[in-house]
A protein has these predicted regions:
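Secreted, luminal/periplasmic, and some membrane-associated catalytic domains
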Residues: 9, 18, 50-51, 75-91, ...
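Basic/polar N-terminal segments that are highly enriched at the extreme N-terminus
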Residues: 1-9, 463-465
């Protein structure tokens, strides 16, 4: 087969990562539904864990975590002795990226990444990714990182500062997705990249707060669809092929599982105390878990402790299965970054990161939106503490201090995980809960598309066979 001539422009693509999109939600999204009906639509077989960083990396490399190395949204960095989530450097990803393959067929192929993960340091032409300003006095202010650097001021002047506190936290809402959509429209209009990747997270918020199958979820779907409509119109007018896909479907949950507390009670997890606050001590713990929604990597320091860890977790309600070396290999998770064991939650359960046994000894970051300090994922950051009668006064005071340029602590996150009603991370058990892939091109997709086939599909749609 001959390669396309480099002087023939590939078919331009817009790839929308519509987080949490499922068949049930699509019924409330007329613009996206029309795109699939005029073009094509299929179920998408996701990867384990079905979480953002892992799924996106599989889409872009065509490989499983066992090869690309992104085993979750975060993991235990053994060489550092630290748990780190939501890193941003593309150097953590192994393998041939979509744009690498595209440029072999078409030198000069241009790519814009608007808020897909592991954007920093990637060999893309245009980058926009959340990146707060961390001041020396401890303040954190909203902002973003861009390449080329001049794009930062261009977007900020046109759209305002990247709305970080609407991207995650108690205030997370449509505002962040709207900013990303508007930034994508601006980049398509002014830069015309061959490939534009855009991440729209709106369905991640109320579906985790209130569940995926009620009026709030359906309203969120309708809101996002209306916000996407002008971008879809722009792409159609330009002759740009649109692919909309999702990383996972969010399912209803009601049972938080305190996996680290179980390990601590068994004498396997260690903490150290400073100023009356307990901190996880991963370097001395015999075992601990890095919780990520419905999957947890369980790190066991010595092989002789594996049986004790298995026995402890076998007795913990809410765990469906523990993957050992063979189980990890079966599920594409056999990578050095994975835990010695991997715990999967039952369908209606999810894992907390909590390791303290007394809330009075919780670290102060537990009640903050602190995605980089917590040794595990904390969806409760989407809420303000309903048990604190002064929570809104505290929030208003903190915001006032922030506006005055003073240090502030927005300590409003509850320590009770029970409000969470939606989660993800397991492989779906039904098509209703499965992610989707839609394409504006007829007959481009059908039946079921594997996440590992998305890369080759996009190359085909671009005309880069």
């Amino acid at each position: 087969m001959t390669s396309p001539r480099s002087d023939t422009r590939p078919t331009p693509l817009l790839v929308l990562d519509v987080v949490g999109l499922t068949p049930r939600l699509l019924e409330h999204m007329p613009h996206l539904r029309a795109l699939g009906r005029a073009g094509s639509q299929a179920a998408l077989s996701t990867v384990l864990p079905a979480v953002t960083c892992t799924a996106q990396t599989t889409f872009l490399t065509g490989t499983l975590p066992s090869e690309h190395g992104i085993v979750a949204n975060g993991w235990y960095f053994r060489e550092l002795g630290d748990v780190l989530l939501w890193r941003q450097h593309n150097g953590l990803v192994s393998g041939d990226r979509l744009w690498d393959a595209a440029r072999r067929s078409h030198p000069g192929y241009t790519v814009a990444n608007i808020c897909w993960w592991y954007a920093m340091g990637a060999d893309t032409d245009i980058t926009v990714t959340p990146r707060p300003v961390y001041y020396a006095d401890g303040r954190k202010e909203p902002d973003c990182y861009t390449r080329p650097p001049a794009l930062h001021d261009e977007l900020t002047e046109k759209l305002g500062t990247f709305p970080l506190f609407h991207f995650w936290g108690p205030g997370a809402d449509l505002v962040s997705s709207q900013w990303i959509i508007d930034a994508t429209r601006h980049i398509l209009r002014t830069r015309r990249p061959d490939l534009a990747l855009a991440y729209v997270p709106h369905l991640d918020y109320d579906l985790q707060r209130y569940g995926p199958d009620g009026p709030r979820a359906f309203r969120a779907a309708a809101e996002l669809d209306a916000a996407l409509a002008p971008l879809l119109d722009d792409a159609r007018a330009e002759g740009r092929t649109v692919v909309a896909l999702s990383e996972y479907g969010i399912t209803r949950v009601s049972r938080p599982v305190d996996i680290n507390r179980a390990l601590r009670r068994a004498g396997l997890l260690e903490v150290h105390t400073q100023d009356g606050m307990e901190y996880l001590d991963p370097m001395t713990s015999r075992a601990f878990a890095v919780a990520d929604h419905q999957l947890a990597h369980v790190y066991v320091r010595r092989p002789e402790d594996l049986d004790a860890v298995r026995e402890t977790l076998a007795e913990l309600p809410g765990i469906e299965r523990l993957l050992d070396d063979e189980g990890k290999k079966e599920n594409g998770l056999d990578h050095p970054r994975s835990g010695e064991l991997v715990a999967l939650a039952e369908p209606d359960a999810w894992f907390t990161y909590y390791y303290w046994l007394d809330d009075a000894r919780a670290p102060d970051f537990a009640q903050l939106v602190e995605i980089h300090r917590k040794p595990g994922y904390d969806p409760v950051e989407l809420f303000m503490d309903p048990l604190d009668p002064y929570v809104r006064i505290k929030a208003a005071t903190a915001i006032a201090r922030k506006k005055l340029g003073m240090r502030y602590r927005l300590a409003v996150v509850p320590l009770d995980p029970s409000p969470i009603r939606g989660s993800h991370g397991r492989l779906p058990t039904s098509d209703d809960e499965s992610p989707l892939i839609l394409c504006s091109t007829p007959r481009a997709v059908s039946g079921r598309v594997a996440a590992t086939d998305v890369k080759s599909l996009l190359l085909h749609l671009a005309g880069l066979h």
